[in-house]
C-alpha cells in the first residue's frame, strides 16, 4: 500500500473517530438533560381536562423543587409511593392548609379559592387539614380525576414532586404555557 493511500485511510479513520466521539458526547449530554433537567411527558387520561388533554406533550423542568417548595397552582409531575409511573396534577393544598371542596367551590383556610381552570364540580365534598410536609394535588377535571382525595394517592410529601409542567409543546395548535 502506498504512503498516500495509507495517509488517506488514517485521515478517514480519524474523521470517523471524531464523528463517533461527537455523537457519543451529544448522546451523553442529551441523557443528562433528560435525567436531571427536563422531561417531555405525553398526557394520557382526562384528569387534567381542559388544561391538558389526552395526547398533549408537555415540557417539565425537573430542577424547580431542588431549592424551593411547590406552590399552590403549580402543575406538577409526581411519583406516588407504591404506584408505578409519573402523574400530572395541580397543587391545591400546602402544609398547614385546611382545604374544603363543596360542589364546584374550593375554600382554603376558610377563604374562597378561585379556580378558573376547573372543568366541572367535584364528585363529592371533601375536607382535609394538611400536616407538616403534606401537599394536596388534584386534577382540574374534579369529577373524573384520581388524585389526592383518593386513599391510594392521598396527601403527598415534598419528595414526591419530580418536576413542574411549563408548557404544551405538541400538538402545535395547543402550544403555549400552562
Annotate the PLM regions.
Residues 2-17, 32, 36, 41-42, ...:
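Soluble "head" domains of membrane/secretory-pathway proteins
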Amino acid at each position: 500500500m502506498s504512503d498516500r493511500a495509507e495517509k488517506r485511510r488514517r485521515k478517514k479513520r480519524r474523521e470517523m473517530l471524531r464523528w463517533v466521539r461527537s455523537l457519543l458526547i451529544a448522546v451523553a449530554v442529551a441523557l443528562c438533560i433528560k435525567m436531571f433537567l427536563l422531561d417531555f411527558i405525553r398526557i394520557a387520561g382526562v384528569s387534567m381536562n381542559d388544561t391538558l388533554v389526552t395526547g398533549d406533550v408537555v415540557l417539565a423542568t425537573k430542577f424547580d423543587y431542588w431549592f424551593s417548595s411547590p406552590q399552590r397552582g403549580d402543575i406538577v409531575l409526581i411519583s406516588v409511593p407504591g404506584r408505578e409511573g409519573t402523574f400530572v396534577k395541580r397543587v391545591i393544598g400546602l402544609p398547614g392548609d385546611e382545604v374544603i371542596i363543596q360542589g364546584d367551590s374550593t375554600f382554603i383556610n376558610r377563604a374562597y379559592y378561585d379556580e378558573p381552570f376547573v372543568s366541572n364540580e367535584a364528585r363529592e365534598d371533601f375536607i382535609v387539614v394538611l400536616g407538616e410536609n403534606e401537599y394536596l394535588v388534584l386534577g382540574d377535571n374534579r369529577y373524573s380525576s384520581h388524585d389526592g382525595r383518593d386513599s391510594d394517592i392521598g396527601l403527598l410529601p415534598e419528595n414526591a414532586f419530580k418536576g413542574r409542567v411549563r408548557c404544551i409543546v405538541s400538538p402545535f395548535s395547543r402550544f403555549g404555557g400552562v
